[in-house]
């Protein structure tokens, strides 16, 4: 407390002592007495009447009672008026009811002349009766009766005028049912066909037209029939023990669906298997391409020995076409500038030996090689890769032909590879055979327009 600031010490100061008050004076009230003297005033309990329980109406019950009373009074009034109503004795009605139409929902701005103008397009009008308000004769009640001279005009107006707009309001056209249909009651007596004042917002009709209201009523009837049919089916299922049968049926359906799913799974496995086969074939093609490159890289000595044997066969004169190929290969290694033309000529010789079975692939490969000679061995390998990827029987046929050529006398690309890789070791062969190679005739070199190369398109 000693260390507190002055403003906080004030809060701990003692309060002032309470003021002194004198003691209250003594009371002069009478003492408490018993009730014995007052028993004669109370009645005897045995002589009391039993309690009568009375029901007090609340606000909702009062409103319901008032509404029912009003409905009953209105029904009594309608029943009395309906007994006195006779449509045939009305002097203001039209003549022939079968030529008369009933028009309702007319705008209060519409006049009788406007109605005659609008309905006069269907045919000549005999009479038009626009019903007036009994309280105010200057205004009409919104409906009228129109009689045509011919019945066909009435039918045309009945079909075409329903839903027509007059003064920005759609009207409803119907036949006169008071004198045509037996036991018909008009709207003022609790009858009629309209649903605009049937009840609440969810019940009242909010659209115009006779056909639309009829279709809506038919839809409601169909919905009710569907609900009744559903209830009938549920009762039959409960009576016949449909729960267990439904369970069995559901199990059967589920098993059937599972079987179909299994079939789809089998088809999916077959599809995946086909894709796997295609991937295996693509892997084999890639391995074959690598094997060809390894063969070209590692078998240079064997190719060189084969070239030597081919040159020996040339001197003996017993190898035929392969000796010509050997001489052309040696000439190719001797003259680099003529390598592209020699390759194309050698390709044509190969096609001639094979009977031109693979004319399309060979011609494409020769044209690609002729245009890409300067790119070296890489373009040759890419051409072979593209040819391998074409797939099908043509690809397998070309692979078999290429294998036989490599086994017999080497491929064209191998000759290129040997030329670039082993050129220093074979330089003396070029010098020995250079003169003999240039002395050989080249009958196809004059055909520089590729007239001997053809394919399926005729190019």
Curated annotation (Swiss-Prot):
<feature type="compositionally biased region" description="Basic and acidic residues">
    <location>
        <begin position="211"/>
        <end position="241"/>
    </location>
</feature>
<comment type="function">
    <text>Mediates the splicing of pre-mRNA by binding to the stem loop I region of U1-snRNA.</text>
</comment>
<dbReference type="GO" id="GO:0005681">
    <property type="term" value="C:spliceosomal complex"/>
</dbReference>
<dbReference type="InterPro" id="IPR012677">
    <property type="entry name" value="Nucleotide-bd_a/b_plait_sf"/>
</dbReference>
<keyword id="KW-0175">Coiled coil</keyword>
<dbReference type="Pfam" id="PF00076">
    <property type="entry name" value="RRM_1"/>
</dbReference>
<dbReference type="InterPro" id="IPR022023">
    <property type="entry name" value="U1snRNP70_N"/>
</dbReference>
<dbReference type="GO" id="GO:0003723">
    <property type="term" value="F:RNA binding"/>
</dbReference>
<dbReference type="GO" id="GO:0071004">
    <property type="term" value="C:U2-type prespliceosome"/>
</dbReference>
<keyword id="KW-0507">mRNA processing</keyword>
<dbReference type="Pfam" id="PF12220">
    <property type="entry name" value="U1snRNP70_N"/>
</dbReference>
<keyword id="KW-0539">Nucleus</keyword>
<feature type="compositionally biased region" description="Basic and acidic residues">
    <location>
        <begin position="263"/>
        <end position="408"/>
    </location>
</feature>
<feature type="region of interest" description="Disordered">
    <location>
        <begin position="185"/>
        <end position="459"/>
    </location>
</feature>
<dbReference type="GO" id="GO:0003729">
    <property type="term" value="F:mRNA binding"/>
</dbReference>
<feature type="compositionally biased region" description="Basic residues">
    <location>
        <begin position="426"/>
        <end position="440"/>
    </location>
</feature>
<dbReference type="InterPro" id="IPR035979">
    <property type="entry name" value="RBD_domain_sf"/>
</dbReference>
<dbReference type="InterPro" id="IPR051183">
    <property type="entry name" value="U1_U11-U12_snRNP_70-35kDa"/>
</dbReference>
<feature type="compositionally biased region" description="Low complexity">
    <location>
        <begin position="242"/>
        <end position="254"/>
    </location>
</feature>
<dbReference type="InterPro" id="IPR000504">
    <property type="entry name" value="RRM_dom"/>
</dbReference>
<dbReference type="GO" id="GO:0043484">
    <property type="term" value="P:regulation of RNA splicing"/>
</dbReference>
<dbReference type="GO" id="GO:0030619">
    <property type="term" value="F:U1 snRNA binding"/>
</dbReference>
<dbReference type="InterPro" id="IPR034143">
    <property type="entry name" value="snRNP70_RRM"/>
</dbReference>
<keyword id="KW-0687">Ribonucleoprotein</keyword>
<dbReference type="GO" id="GO:0005685">
    <property type="term" value="C:U1 snRNP"/>
</dbReference>
<dbReference type="GO" id="GO:0008380">
    <property type="term" value="P:RNA splicing"/>
</dbReference>
<keyword id="KW-0694">RNA-binding</keyword>
<feature type="domain" description="RRM">
    <location>
        <begin position="99"/>
        <end position="178"/>
    </location>
</feature>
<protein>
    <recommendedName>
        <fullName>U1 small nuclear ribonucleoprotein 70 kDa</fullName>
    </recommendedName>
</protein>
<dbReference type="GO" id="GO:0000398">
    <property type="term" value="P:mRNA splicing, via spliceosome"/>
</dbReference>
């Amino acid at each position: 407390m000693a260390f507190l600031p002055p403003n906080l010490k004030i809060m701990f100061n003692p309060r002032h002592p309470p003021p002194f008050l004198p003691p209250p004076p003594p009371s002069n009230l009478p003492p408490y007495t018993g009730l014995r003297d007052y028993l004669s005033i109370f009645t005897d309990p045995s002589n009391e009447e039993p309690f009568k329980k009375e029901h007090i109406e609340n606000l909702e019950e009062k409103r319901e009672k008032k509404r029912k009373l009003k409905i009953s009074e209105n029904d009594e009034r309608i029943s009395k008026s309906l007994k006195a109503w006779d449509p045939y004795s009305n002097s203001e009605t039209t003549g022939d009811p079968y030529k008369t139409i009933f028009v309702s929902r007319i705008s209060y701005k519409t006049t009788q002349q406007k109605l005659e103008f609008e309905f006069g397009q269907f045919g000549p009008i005999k009479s038009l009766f626009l019903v007036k308000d009994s309280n105010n004769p200057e205004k009409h009640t919104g409906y009228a009766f129109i009689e045509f001279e011919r019945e066909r005009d009435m039918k045309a107006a009945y079909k075409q005028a329903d839903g027509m707009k007059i003064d920005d309001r759609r009207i409803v056209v119907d036949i006169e049912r008071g004198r045509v249909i037996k036991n018909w009651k008009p709207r003022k007596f609790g009858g009629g066909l309209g649903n605009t004042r049937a009840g609440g917002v969810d019940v009242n009709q909010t659209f115009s037209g006779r056909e639309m209201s009829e279709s809506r009523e038919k839809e409601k009837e169909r919905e009710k029939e569907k609900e009744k049919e559903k209830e009938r089916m549920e009762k039959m299922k409960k009576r016949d023990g449909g729960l267990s049968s439904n369970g069995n049926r559901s199990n059967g359906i589920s098993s059937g669906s599972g079987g179909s799913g299994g079939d789809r799974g089998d088809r999916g496995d077959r599809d995946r298997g086909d894709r796997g086969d295609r991937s295996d074939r693509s892997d084999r093609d890639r391995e074959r391409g690598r094997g060809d490159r390894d063969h070209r890289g590692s078998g240079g000595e064997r190719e060189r020995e084969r070239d030597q044997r081919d040159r020996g066969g040339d001197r003996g004169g017993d190898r035929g076409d392969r000796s010509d190929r050997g001489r052309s290969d040696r000439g190719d290694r001797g003259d680099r500038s003529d390598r592209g033309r020699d390759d194309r000529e050698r390709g044509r010789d190969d096609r001639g030996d094979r009977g031109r079975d693979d004319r399309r692939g060979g011609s494409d490969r020769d044209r690609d090689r002729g245009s890409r000679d300067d790119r070296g061995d890489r373009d040759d390998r890419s051409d072979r890769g593209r040819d391998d990827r074409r797939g099908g029987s043509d690809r397998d046929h070309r692979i078999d032909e290429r294998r036989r050529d490599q086994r017999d006398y080497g491929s064209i690309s191998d000759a290129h590879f040997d030329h670039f890789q082993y050129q220093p070791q074979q330089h003396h062969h070029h010098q020995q055979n250079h003169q003999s190679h240039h002395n050989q005739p080249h009958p196809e070199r004059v055909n520089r327009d590729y007239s001997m190369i053809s394919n399926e398109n005729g190019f």
